[in-house]
Amino acid sequence: MLNRKLVNRVEYFRVIVMAFAAFVFNTTEFVPVALLSDIADSFQMPVSNTGLMITIYAWIVSLCSLPCMLMTARLERRRLLISLFILFIASHILSAFAWNYEVLLIARAGVALTHSIFWSITAALTIRIAPKNKKTQALGLLALGSSLAMVLGLPLGRIIGQAFGWRTTFTLIGVFAALILILIVRLLPKIPSQNAGSLKSLPVLARRPMLITLYIFTILVISAHFTAYSYIEPFMIQIGRVSANKATAVLLIFGVSGVVASVLFSRLYRIAPIKFLLSSVAILTLALICLYGVSGISGAIFALVFIWGVAISALSLAMQMKVLQLAPDATDVATAIYSGIYNIGIGGGALIGNQVMQHLGLANIGYVGAVLGAVSIIWFILMFLKFSRVPLNIVNQ
């Protein structure tokens, strides 16, 4: 009994290491948002041009997730993680010493490549190393690490960047990643590739209607969210008439809400997965509908943003878990496709929001996002009703 408890502790600590890894990956993905002005000043560029770094990052992840995962499908997972972190650290060193913007883009491309593989394998890997009967909780802890990147990583990165320069922020991210690498080397056992899938998996996955339904649902939902979220700061300042500091606080509220969402997911998802998923997107859609209506009411807008953040974070977790459940025999391929599709949603939502601002006005980003949210609900319900009676080995529900 004592030995079993010790094993459980070691396994759970391994999950914590993966949560730290998720934290550092999400921090480096979003921290440029807080450093754009400083980066632009150092290279004597307009902020709008510097911002292309974020777009390029997202599209590299989107394009490379599946090909990179397939190329690494047979590699032992511990060795693969070590290799990813070495490239991740080297890319941050290059970022810190980048002598021009083009070199910084190359460095960020290296980080994006590691991102595309890391998120393709991490969810399934975390579940494999978790203690028995703690699989859902392990995924929730992984999500907690991601959420803390918004709560702690983003503001700390901004504070450090303002005090010591943006290069110091990237340097410290690299140092933190090096500490995680040491823990991976010391704590993770050899983890053979398992159910990773291959090119042969693609036709098999394509014949799973609920998986395809979920992928399309993901594009719609994430586009709905990022149609509004991409421009939440100017919306708060120009439409909500709040100060710049309060607008920044909104981003922190989103991070805190992710922590709450991970707790709710751990406790509620396994009870009724489909209801949990649909309830989350329904709440998200309602929040987007109400965004403009409460924008001028300080307390109400903060409460709404918190609810919105809980909904999208819970929804992201539910979709990721559902992908794993629908493709247990090709988890890495299915997750790689999901990661790429998720980033398509990010880019698509930002583009839609941009067009809404130009043609309908900033005030309407919530309404357009809500339309996409409503379409996603209708799509999922219709497809679920259509395919819910398909044999289990095809639908894999």
UniProtKB/Swiss-Prot annotation:
One of its GO terms (cellular component) is plasma membrane. Keywords: Cell inner membrane, Cell membrane, Membrane, Sugar transport, Transmembrane, Transmembrane helix, Transport. The chain crosses the membrane at residues 15-35, 51-71, 80-100, 103-123, 137-157, 169-189, 209-229, 246-266, 277-297, 299-319, 333-353, 365-385. Belongs to the major facilitator superfamily. SotB (TC 2.A.1.2) family. This is Probable sugar efflux transporter. The keyword Transport applies. It is a multi-pass membrane protein. It is found in: Cell inner membrane. GO terms for molecular function: carbohydrate transmembrane transporter activity. It comes from Mannheimia succiniciproducens (strain KCTC 0769BP / MBEL55E). It holds the Pfam family MFS_1. Its main location: membrane. Involved in the efflux of sugars. The physiological role may be the reduction of the intracellular concentration of toxic sugars or sugar metabolites.
